[in-house]
Amino acid sequence: MELLWYIIAALGAGIGTGAVLTLLGGFMLLLYFWPQISRFPLAMQTLQCFGRLIVYIVPCVMALLPIRFLTGVPSFVFRKMLHVVAFTCFVVMMLAAGGWQAAALTSVIIAVLVYPLLSLFENESWYGKLFVQKSPGEVKRSLLMVFFMFAAVIAVSWGVFHDPNAAAAAILMWGVGDAAAALVGIPFGKHKVNFRPVNGKKSWEGSLAMFTAAALVGIVILCLCSGSFTGTSILCVLLMALAGTTAELLSPSEWDTVTVPVTMLAVALVLL
């Protein structure tokens, strides 16, 4: 137990040091250029988005550290817990943003900041213990793709089609559906999907779980939150879930974080 607490303390120190140095550097730049920055509404809205992300992410990370090192939670479960924090925090940030430009810009800036930060620490011993990687460098590549995907989905759905609910639905349906596929498919997936080009590692049980979870989330977002509980909305949600599940089956492992939400969003924008 003492060793576990030592590991957590070391992790907290490493992560905390990097985070504090990054925040201090950003804060000093912010103070220096504040007279210029405060003149631009987009800059102020983007700073508000950053603030919401920090308020959301920090408590989540503090809660996940002891779960990772003080419990016997399987690695694939913890990986999905990290994913849940990532996609929910950006949806919350987006829906509370003053405009799509600020939300999309925040996603891009986070990608630019996180990638070199993870590259700096990826050779540390605690990095491999905290993050669950399928291959070397997979976490930072995945996060880079996810953040740019968030920016693109927000820009297209909200910026072009003026529909932030569709972006929220696509991101949440993908995130929850992907988690359900892993949580059901890995321990209970007995019947593998063997037709080409599926790689044979995915199961019908996991795909069914993804479809069901994605459909339920889509109904809540598109139908209840938008006040449009109609047959057309239900059909749209089911087709989004089906298209996303199919995209997940056919996509290479690391690319499903992009192909699935983009496919779901495309279906929503065409049908709604």
Roles of regions detected by a PLM:
Residues M1-F27, L31-I54, V61-L105, V114-L224, ...:
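Interhelical loop and helix-boundary elements at the membrane-water interface
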